[in-house]
């Protein structure tokens, strides 16, 4: 049985530390046609902020996952479909590869392992908050990106490889390298998707595209265009 995300073309990532576009609701976001919602952010994450967004989105007929950046942002809620836990493979600080995860296990006795999945992040924009936060080595070539993707799938058994260019549109060849290096893992791509064309282009190289800032900056109509682009590229 394949994982549910293996069938997704598009995900909206909601940052609980940011507001939605003026006049919009979470119902508007859920109605864009996206395949799933991922709730999380790099900084400013708290359990209270996470819980607010989970409560507002879980009532809608769409898969909802949270991506906790620290143990204090974990929400235990039966309405959630699961937890996507980031491991940054090219982090300069190993805390973001295994350290934070060890602390979560040590401090939280209620982890639902059946609904917990890791994302193998490869961070490639040196100007992104996540790159600074994790001290990521973003100076990678295509062979190195492919190798990281293969390590994630073959050595660590990770089902999701996440090529992250947060804040800019990435190099399609880098994304394709990760896709070519994997056999069964799903390749997520995030970064700089602002319209139909960018979603269409990046979906041709990744299994799933993730749209984040756009939902906060421009709103549901703009997100809907990216959904159309991703879906058309998948056909």
From Swiss-Prot:
Q: What name is this protein filed under?
A: Geranylgeranylglyceryl phosphate synthase
**What EC number(s) are associated with this protein in UniProt?**
2.5.1.41
Q: What class of enzyme is it?
A: transferase
Keywords (A to Z) from UniProt: Cytoplasm, Lipid biosynthesis, Lipid metabolism, Magnesium, Metal-binding, Phospholipid biosynthesis, Phospholipid metabolism, Transferase
Q: Which GO terms describe its biological process?
A: glycerophospholipid biosynthetic process
Q: List the Gene3D superfamilies.
A: FMN-linked oxidoreductases (3.20.20.390)
An example GO CC term for this entry is: cytoplasm
Q: What is the lineage of its organism?
A: Archaea, Methanobacteriati, Methanobacteriota, Stenosarchaea group, Halobacteria
The entry marks the following residues as binding Mg(2+), namely: 15, 42
Cofactor requirements of the protein: Mg(2+)
Binding sites annotated in the UniProt record for sn-glycerol 1-phosphate? 13, 162-167, 192, 212-213
Catalytic reaction equation(s): sn-glycerol 1-phosphate + (2E,6E,10E)-geranylgeranyl diphosphate = sn-3-O-(geranylgeranyl)glycerol 1-phosphate + diphosphate
Q: What does this protein do?
A: Prenyltransferase that catalyzes the transfer of the geranylgeranyl moiety of geranylgeranyl diphosphate (GGPP) to the C3 hydroxyl of sn-glycerol-1-phosphate (G1P). This reaction is the first ether-bond-formation step in the biosynthesis of archaeal membrane lipids.
Q: Which Pfam families match?
A: PcrB
Keyword Transmembrane helix on this protein? no
**The UniProt record lists the keyword Nucleotide-binding:** no
State which pathway it belongs to.
Answer: Membrane lipid metabolism; glycerophospholipid metabolism
Say which family it is in. Answer: Belongs to the GGGP/HepGP synthase family. Group I subfamily.
What HAMAP family does its record include?
A: GGGP_HepGP_synthase (MF_00112)
Compartment annotation: Cytoplasm
Q: What molecular function terms (GO) are annotated for this protein? A: magnesium ion binding; phosphoglycerol geranylgeranyltransferase activity
């Amino acid at each position: 049985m394949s994982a549910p995300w293996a069938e997704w073309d598009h995900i909206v990532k909601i940052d609980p530390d940011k507001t939605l576009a003026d006049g919009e609701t979470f119902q508007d976001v859920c109605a864009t046609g996206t395949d799933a919602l991922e709730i999380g952010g790099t900084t400013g994450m708290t359990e209270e902020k996470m819980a607010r967004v989970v409560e507002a989105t879980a009532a809608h007929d769409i898969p909802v996952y949270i991506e906790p950046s620290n143990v204090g942002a974990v929400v235990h809620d039966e309405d959630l479909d699961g937890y996507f836990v980031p491991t940054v493979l090219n982090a300069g600080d190993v805390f973001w590869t295994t350290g934070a995860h060890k602390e979560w296990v040590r401090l939280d006795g209620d982890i639902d392992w059946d609904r917990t999945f890791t994302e193998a992040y490869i961070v490639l924009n040196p100007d992104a908050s996540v790159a600074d936060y994790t001290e990521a080595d973003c100076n990678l070539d295509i062979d190195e990106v492919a190798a990281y993707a293969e390590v994630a799938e073959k050595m660590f058994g990770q089902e999701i490889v996440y090529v992250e260019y947060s804040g800019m549109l990435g190099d399609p060849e880098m994304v394709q390298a990760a896709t070519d290096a994997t056999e069964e893992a799903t390749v997520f791509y995030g970064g700089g998707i602002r319209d139909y064309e960018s979603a269409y282009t990046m979906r041709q190289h990744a299994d799933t595209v993730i749209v984040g800032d756009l939902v906060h900056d421009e709103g549901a109509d703009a997100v809907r265009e990216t959904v159309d682009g991703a879906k058309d590229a998948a056909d």
